[in-house]
A protein has these predicted regions:
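Catalytic pocket-lining loop regions of alpha/beta-barrel enzymes
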Residues: 1-77
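Divalent metal-coordination and catalytic microenvironments
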Residues: 13, 43, 81, 110, ...
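Tryptophan-centric aromatic hotspots in well-structured domains and transmembrane helices
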Residues: 28-31, 55, 59, 82, ...
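Short Gly/Pro-enriched loop/turn and capping motifs at secondary-structure junctions
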Residues: 48-50, 82-85
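Mid-to-C-terminal alpha-helical segments outside catalytic/metal-binding sites
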Residues: 66, 70-77, 86-124
């Protein structure tokens, strides 16, 4: 990946964390820290219900915050994972949870996270 710095790689589902234990989180964070050092990797935060079928804001918050802190707002993208997410939640719960998680970000940071980064990376 470092050999081709102009190719943008999107890491899907925040690296797909499967479990919500402290040991798993620490191991996941260690891997994400290594990945985040590669500047052409963008982290798409989506589908966290796949590893946590009864997820809450509090259960996903450490994963979301870690991604945002490691990759920075400029290299994170919000996404849903429909229709798979519908197995574990509903659309308004997902959207409202992420709105709550990002409430302290500036308007520019929210715009970047929720749509501007995706527009740039996907060329839409």
């Amino acid at each position: 990946l470092k050999t081709f710095p102009n190719i943008k790689i999107v890491l899907d589902h925040a690296g797909n964390p499967d479990f919500r234990t402290k040991a798993y989180f620490e191991n996941w964070k260690k891997g994400m820290t290594k990945i985040s050092k590669i500047e052409n990797i963008i982290c798409k935060i989506s589908g966290l219900g796949m590893g946590d079928h009864h997820w809450t804001k509090d259960s996903i918050l450490p994963y979301v915050e870690t991604c945002m802190n490691l990759f920075g707002i400029s290299r994170t993208i919000f996404a849903t994972n429909w229709p798979v997410d519908s197995l574990y939640s509903n659309y308004s719960k997902v959207i409202n949870t992420y709105i709550e998680i990002t409430k302290d970000l500036s308007e520019d940071e929210k715009d970047a996270f929720f749509f501007k980064n995706a527009e740039e990376i996907y060329g839409i």
